[in-house]
Amino acid sequence: MEWHSKFSGPNTSPGFLLWQATQSWQRKVGKALAEFDLTHVQFVLLTSCKYMIAHGETVTQKKLASFSQTNIMMVSEVVRTLEKKGFIERSKNPQDKREVLLSLTEIGGEKVTAALPIVEKIDQAFFAAAMKKENFLSGLQELLKHE
């Protein structure tokens, strides 16, 4: 069977390398978050919600999906799970009954406060070598601009 690719192999394919790095990073974060009864996605949405609230934003599922650049249907499912766990509360917007507002419970806020430093420590260790490279963060930011 012949191999036809612009890249000489997996180690020169940026997409494949990004995929592998993402999988490795997510495994490390997921393992650490298990002790908090959170998946990586739950942590990201819970932390994003807390960040948005702390910065004076009214949080809806649509705004949370936009902020975290995730699918609205997935956000809806994850928020439902976080609500069942007692980490998030949903309520109707008094100004617009069609809109559901999100807020963190005390327990949800405590989960973020406890888990965030651990995830940040993992991020620092995992990305340390790449952060030494000039333009690493700006390169990632540039990738997100073209979505």
From Swiss-Prot:
Keyword terms: DNA-binding, Transcription, Transcription regulation
Signal peptide location: none
HTH marR-type domain sequence ranges: 11-147
DNA-binding region per UniProt: 61-84
Record-linked SUPFAM superfamilies: Winged helix' DNA-binding domain
InterPro entries: HTH_MarR-typ (IPR000835), MarR/SlyA-like (IPR039422), WH-like_DNA-bd_sf (IPR036388), WH_DNA-bd_sf (IPR036390)
Gene Ontology MF: a single term: DNA binding
GO terms, biological process: regulation of DNA-templated transcription; response to stress
Transmembrane segments: none
Domain of life: Bacteria
Pfam families in the cross-refs: MarR
Entry-linked SMART domains: HTH_MARR
Name of the protein this chain belongs to: Uncharacterized HTH-type transcriptional regulator YdcH
Gene name as annotated: ydcH
